[in-house]
From Swiss-Prot:
Designated name of the protein: Bifurcating [FeFe] hydrogenase alpha subunit
Pfam families documented for this protein: 2Fe-2S_thioredx (PF01257), Fe_hyd_lg_C (PF02906), Fe_hyd_SSU (PF02256), Fer2_4 (PF13510), Fer4_7 (PF12838), NADH-G_4Fe-4S_3 (PF10588)
Ligand binding ([2Fe-2S] cluster 1): C34, C45, C48, C60
CDD domains registered for this protein in UniProt: fer2 (cd00207), TRX_Fd_family (cd02980)
Binding-site residues, [4Fe-4S] cluster 1: H92, C96, C99, C105
Cystine pairs: none
GO cellular component, one term: membrane
Reactions accelerated catalytically: 2 H2 + 2 oxidized [2Fe-2S]-[ferredoxin] + NAD(+) = 2 reduced [2Fe-2S]-[ferredoxin] + NADH + 3 H(+)
List of residues binding [4Fe-4S] cluster 3: C153, C186, C189, C192
Main location: cytoplasm
SMART domains for the chain: Fe_hyd_SSU (SM00902), NADH-G_4Fe-4S_3 (SM00929)
Positions of [4Fe-4S] cluster 4 binding: C295, C350, C482, C486
2Fe-2S ferredoxin-type domain mapped to chain residues: 1-76
Amino acid sequence: MKIYVDGREVIINDNERNLLEALKNVGIEIPNLCYLSEASIYGACRMCLVEINGQITTSCTLKPYEGMKVKTNTPEIYEMRRNILELILATHNRDCTTCDRNGSCKLQKYAEDFGIRKIRFEALKKEHVRDESAPVVRDTSKCILCGDCVRVCEEIQGVGVIEFAKRGFESVVTTAFDTPLIETECVLCGQCVAYCPTGALSIRNDIDKLIEALESDKIVIGMIAPAVRAAIQEEFGIDEDVAMAEKLVSFLKTIGFDKVFDVSFGADLVAYEEAHEFYERLKKGERLPQFTSCCPAWVKHAEHTYPQYLQNLSSVKSPQQALGTVIKKIYARKLGVPEEKIFLVSFMPCTAKKFEAEREEHEGIVDIVLTTRELAQLIKMSRIDINRVEPQPFDRPYGVSSQAGLGFGKAGGVFSCVLSVLNEEIGIEKVDVKSPEDGIRVAEVTLKDGTSFKGAVIYGLGKVKKFLEERKDVEIIEVMACNYGCVGGGGQPYPNDSRIREHRAKVLRDTMGIKSLLTPVENLFLMKLYEEDLKDEHTRHEILHTTYRPRRRYPEKDVEILPVPNGEKRTVKVCLGTSCYTKGSYEILKKLVDYVKENDMEGKIEVLGTFCVENCGASPNVIVDDKIIGGATFEKVLEELSKNG
């Protein structure tokens, strides 16, 4: 298609989504603060104004047509853009030097580009909130109401934990009832952070904890994820460096790390264990489909939204936690030191990994998680030129990995790695990969023992619900919360859009190409670990496997009925939500209260009313201590109370 831009002829694709993208694809960048190619068109910021036949309109909402005449930089458009920026800045927190986005903020960049040195409009003040309850930090004083986070959370991730509230000047993006983020169903994927154009959303910085550890007498060990090495060079103006991981090892040793291991070894370990777990389930026809569990954002989403599928999640830990447990439980013993002596630092592309490390199931394993951006900050703080660092290999025994293990950093990597193990152990007769539909890839696999199954790769949590409703014939499903997998994690450098993520996936593939080992089975260090330290099933289960639990999507609000203030007690919570109430929970509550009173147990059994335990399909629900009883009856509650006292 031929259009005319500022008086010159330009050829664009016929199927462009809008004029904004069409111009971007031919090298003409129109300013914008609210446009996301992956989400719906919003048109709120008005920065992307262009003139068409004398009429000024937003380029993000305009479809190009043959012969269109476009003006992108008239004096009138320039003045309108400046006015918009000044109005935004008038109520914006302009403490740029202490902002997490200093140097990468789009608003800051445009203010510089348009030469804004003073604000002509009076600054009006409104109440702001800074929520630091979770690894994702919210600061409404820096929010420009672009709606990017709202659309990403709702449309791409299907979570919808944040939304616009109030009206006019008082408008704000917040959670339901202004609930702290950590108490909501937020999966902490960080995609809102990745797409936020300002510092309104950021990631909790844990560098100070590392500095403190480096100054102590602890053994400081680092481990680096695959996707980190594919992106960190962006912070230093390097297009691609397949030796970046080894340079990072050298840098970390320089600042005081004692050992640096490769999380790709943990990926080999997880894939090997998960392949055997899947094959056993497949042969028995139990707990299928098996979902991968490497992505902590997906795991948290499943706990909130799909409690019925928790038994289907692979019980194998993520590479971070599996390798971390091996280091703390096995490597520490071989060093002859208590595990508390080791301070373990995980370098990840992911914000949810911070939450994963803090889960009670993993307490004391990974001490801190630093994102790719935090690692870049660490390098900049040190004043060391990463380009001139002499590469060093990862430390043995957990520094050797396969191509397949390194592939965990991109979408499809986990499934491919599991297949590589099955091919080595059993043999694959045929793999038939179907054409992707809505970004979801499905493959039909036939093993040499005659067993066949289907596998799927899904990235973006918003695609999961529809897929599960429509497809019941898939036996193994890889789910990654972030588009393009871990290379698109919320902790990766800015910008973090689809084009950049595609490039990172390419860098990772190029890096995989220099690996001599193809599959985890070829990793002799992994096989030695199994032979020496993971010989029996009990040890493997203790070191490599974990558990999951249903989580509420809303804060727990209980009603005291028979409270017991202090002392040793059993607690019974009867759900009084609509579904449970209509199916008899109130009758259970009445019987329970009468039972406690008649048997003089008011100081021993606490009775509470609660609302929505996220298990409506099994109503009525009663929680005895921490155990949810679905399809509850008064008799079942008494039976549970009779256990352990």
